[in-house]
Design a protein with these regions (language model features):
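Long, histidine/aromatic-enriched segments associated with O2/redox biology
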Residues: 3-453
Length: 453
C-alpha cells in the first residue's frame, strides 16, 4: 500500500462548508446542475465531460473477507476523492452500479433473495427488478449483451478531473489529485477493466467535434444542438426529477419501501448506440422534428428545445391516432405512455405529481468512439463514429424493457403498414452493446450487501 500519507484536504478547504447544499441520498441526482431558459423551456446544464469504466471483479468468488475488505477500500477511496474535488459539476460526480453477475456470483443467494428489489407482477412481488439485458425486435445480429460486474460513471465540467481520478483509482503508483500526490485511493487490483467509454454533453459540441474529425454530415448538425441528431437532450420536463426513478418512489413498480436496503437505488441501463448521421440529415427539418417528438409538432428550425412539459405528453390513444392519421410515429411519443404517469400520482414520500410527469431519467452523452476507447472483449476502430453512450434509470428493468420495445414500434408499424423511416428513428441507430445494472444509494455504493454476508 501507499507510503504517502492521505492528504488532509479538508484542512485547507472544506467543500462541505464552501458549498451549501444537502448531499442527495441517491447517486443519480446531480448537485449543482443549473437550469437555463430556452424560449421559456427549462433546460438542465449537465456536466460537459463523461467517462464510463466497466469491469469484472478480480477477487475470488466466495471469499467473504476479501469482499468486505474491498467494500472498505472503495468506500475510503471515493470519500477521499470527494474530499478533494467538490461534489459538483466543477469538481467530479461519480456513480457506481453493479451488474447481475455481481449479485449472482459474489453475494450468497440467501442474502440476495432477501434484499434484492422485486418487480410487482400481477399485484405481487415477482422476479428481481434487475434482469439480464435482452435483444429487442430491431436489434442487429452482432449486438453484445454484456455481463460486467461493475460500472463507474465519472462526470465533470473538467476533463482533467476525470482523467486524474481514473488514474488514481485504477493505475498503481503515485498519482496526482488536484495537485496533491496520492496512492491511498488506488483500488485497481480489485478489478479487471473491460471497457473505457468517453464522451461529452454540451450545447454545440456534436457539431464542433464532428467537424474537427471530418465526420460526414457534420455541417448539417444544427449549431448549438446537444445531440448529433439535433435538438436538446436535457429538457428538465423530459428528465425524471428528484427520486422518481428510484425503486420505491412510485407505488406499484417494485416491492421496495423507504425503509428497504435498496431504497434510493434504481435500475440503470447502459448501452452504446451508433448513429447514421447522413441518413438522418437526408430528412428535412420538419421530418426530423416529427420523428424525434411526434407528427403534430410544428416548431421552426431555430427551436432546439421544444417543450416537454407534462401537458405535451402523448398517451396511447393519441399515439395510435398518429399512426392512423399521420402515418408516422415520433420517438418520444412512442414511449411516453409508459415513461410518464397516466394520472395524478402520489409518491410514497407524499408528493403529488401531475399526469404526464416523466419517471424515467436519462444521463446519456455523445461520443465519437467506435465503439469504445478501450474494449477488452472486442475490436476498437480508430475511425470516429457519431453515437451515444446511453444511460437511463427506471424503477425496474421490466419497465425499461417495455419502454424500449415500444421504441421499435413493431405492433403499430404492422397494424398501419408504416415504413421503417416513419417509425420513430430506430432505422438510423445501431446498438452495439447493452447491459442492465443496479445503481444503489450513495450509502451502499461500495459493494452492496457485502456487510450482510
Amino acid at each position: 500500500m501507499s507510503n504517502i500519507a492521505a492528504f488532509d484536504w479538508a484542512g485547507v478547504v472544506n467543500y462541505a462548508k464552501r458549498r451549501v447544499g444537502e448531499v442527495p441520498k441517491t447517486q443519480y441526482e446531480l448537485p449543482g446542475v443549473n437550469v437555463e431558459n430556452h424560449c421559456d423551456v427549462p433546460v438542465a446544464c449537465v456536466p460537459l465531460w463523461h467517462s464510463v469504466v466497466t469491469a469484472r471483479l478480480s477477487i475470488q468468488k466466495g471469499d467473504k473477507a476479501a469482499l468486505k475488505q474491498a467494500k472498505e477500500r472503495l468506500d475510503k477511496a471515493l470519500a477521499a476523492i470527494e474530499a478533494i474535488y467538490p461534489l459538483y459539476p466543477d469538481g467530479i460526480l461519480i456513480q457506481v452500479a453493479y451488474g447481475l453477475p455481481y449479485f449472482r456470483e459474489f453475494v450468497p443467494k440467501v442474502v440476495a433473495d432477501k434484499f434484492m428489489p422485486r418487480a410487482i407482477e400481477n399485484g405481487k412481488p415477482g422476479d428481481w427488478a434487475i434482469t439480464d439485458a435482452i435483444k429487442y425486435p430491431k436489434d442487429p445480429a452482432h449486438l453484445v449483451l454484456e455481463q460486467n460486474d461493475i460500472s463507474f460513471h465519472f462526470k465533470s465540467d473538467y476533463a482533467d478531473h476525470i482523467s486524474e481520478v481514473m488514474r488514481a483509482l485504477f493505475q498503481p503508483g503515485p498519482q496526482m489529485l488536484n495537485g496533491i500526490p496520492t496512492e491511498d485511493v488506488y483500488v485497481g487490483d480489485l478489478f479487471t477493466i473491460t471497457s473505457i467509454r468517453r464522451g461529452f454533453a454540451g450545447h454545440g459540441m456534436p457539431r464542433v467535434m464532428a467537424q474537427r474529425l471530418g465526420i460526414p454530415g457534420a455541417d448539417k448538425i444544427p449549431p448549438g444542438a446537444m445531440l448529433f441528431m439535433g435538438f436538446t437532450s436535457s429538457h428538465v420536463h423530459g428528465l425524471a426529477q428528484g427520486t422518481l426513478p428510484s425503486f420505491e418512489t412510485i407505488p406499484g413498480y417494485t416491492d421496495q419501501t423507504p425503509e428497504s436496503y435498496f431504497a434510493n437505488g434504481t435500475m440503470m441501463h447502459l448501452s452504446h448506440i451508433a448513429i447514421d448521421l447522413e441518413g438522418w440529415y437526408n430528412i428535412n427539418h420538419a421530418g426530423r422534428l416529427q420523428r424525434m417528438f411526434h407528427a403534430r409538432r410544428t416548431e421552426t428550425e431555430e427551436v432546439l428545445s421544444p417543450s416537454q412539459a407534462p401537458d405535451t405528453t402523448t398517451f396511447k390513444e393519441q399515439l395510435e391516432d398518429d399512426a392512423k392519421t399521420h402515418k408516422l410515429l415520433g420517438h418520444n411519443a412512442q414511449m411516453q405512455f409508459l415513461s410518464r404517469v397516466d394520472k395524478d400520482t402520489t409518491t410514497v414520500y407524499g408528493d403529488v405529481i401531475p399526469k404526464g410527469t416523466v419517471i424515467f431519467l436519462r444521463q446519456d452523452f455523445d461520443t465519437v468512439e467506435n465503439p469504445f476507447e478501450f474494449n477488452a472483449d472486442g475490436p476498437v476502430s480508430p475511425a470516429p463514429k457519431p453515437g451515444v453512450h446511453f444511460i437511463g434509470f427506471a424503477p425496474s428493468a421490466q419497465l425499461f424493457d417495455k419502454i424500449r420495445k415500444e421504441m421499435d414500434g413493431v405492433d403499430l408499424q404492422k397494424k398501419y403498414n408504416l415504413p421503417d423511416e416513419n417509425t420513430g428513428f430506430t432505422k438510423f441507430l445501431v446498438t452495439t452493446h447493452r447491459q442492465h445494472y443496479l445503481e444503489p444509494s450513495r450509502a451502499h455504493r461500495s459493494f452492496p450487501l457485502a456487510e450482510m454476508i
